[in-house]
Structure formats: structure tokens, C-alpha cells
Amino acid sequence: MKATDLLAMFSLSVVLSACGGVQAGGNVQSGVQAMLAGNNQTALSYFQAAAQQDPTYIYNAQLQLGVMSYLGRAQYLTGNYAQAVQTLEQARVQNSGDNLAQLYLGLSQARLGNQQAGLQNIAASMKQIMVWLNFLNGNYPGQGWDPDGAIQSRIQNAQAMMSSGNVEWYRLFADGEAVGLGVAQQEQTFRQLNIDAT
């Protein structure tokens, strides 16, 4: 094989892989919009397509949130808890600091009956999300991160209940889901503000 043939094949593979990333990005963006609109089955389809195109695709570069994190969240929101656990564990391997993946992992584990592991992951993720929100609000006031305190209030309610030892699971699920979707909405709002500013 000639050097020019090898170069042509390499160039083609680079172009095709770039196209996969662009397609994955478009599918993740559409999936996020569907998820935030409550169209979880549609969101799941978009995230599945993105994961097939590029399972390592990072949608939110600042927070390093990958497609597997979004896919796992959509699996949880559509009741596919066992699949969600597998996908979210994979997302946590890709980014151990993905607090939303850890939150939904804990919610999925608890829904499957592994309440001890679920509670540990829910508590740890909520603690880190609260630290993150406090950091953002302290260092970037007026940027719109949880302006009415709804996310922080849900976290505080959940933390108080978990520390009491008297966990009402239906309330913890509701609080956890509200925190997860609230953070996702805030991320999308902030992302859009940054896009509009450029």
C-alpha cells in the first residue's frame, strides 16, 4: 500500500469520526431539550443514538458531562432502573465527579431495592451539588444558578430526612428527581446564556 493511500484512509477516518461527534452532539442537545420538556422516551431515543455514535462524547465540556450520564438519567426517568445502574456506573468511570450521574445511580439503586447503596450515593451527590451551588452563587452572583433556592431547599429537605434515619422513600425520590431536573435546567439555561453572549 502506498503512503498516499494510507494518508487518504487516515484522513477519511478522521473525517468520519468528526462527523460522529457532530451527530452525537446534535442528538444529545435534542435529548436534553426533550428531557427538560418531560418527553423522557424521546430523550432516551436521542441519547441512545448519541451513545451509539460516540459513547465517549462530552456534551458539557465545563462539567465534563458525557453522553452516558444523560443516557443513564433518561433510562431512570423511563423506569429502566437496571439499565440505568449499568450506564450510570459507566458514566462515573468516565467522570467520577459527575454528581448527577451519582444522584441518579443512587435513585436507581434504591428503586431496585439496594437502599443502602442508593442512600449513600444520593447523600454524597446531594452534598456535592450543594457545595457546587454555594460555590457558584458565592463566586458568580447574579448568574442565575438556583435564583429562587428551589434546588437547595429540596437538597436541605432530603438531607434532613436522610440524617434523621426515617427515610420516606417516595419523598426522597421526589426530592432527588426535582434536584436532578432542576440542576439540568439550570445547566441548560446557563449554557444558552453563554451561547447567546458569544
PLM regions with names:
Residues L16-A37:
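Bacterial Sec signal peptide processing site at the extreme N-terminus
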Residues A51, L107-N134:
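TPR/TPR-like (Sel1-like) alpha-helical repeat modules
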Residues L63-Q64, Y70, Y104, G138:
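Canonical tetratricopeptide repeat
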Residues W132-T198:
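Terminal, low-structured helical/coil segments at or just beyond the last alpha-helical repeat
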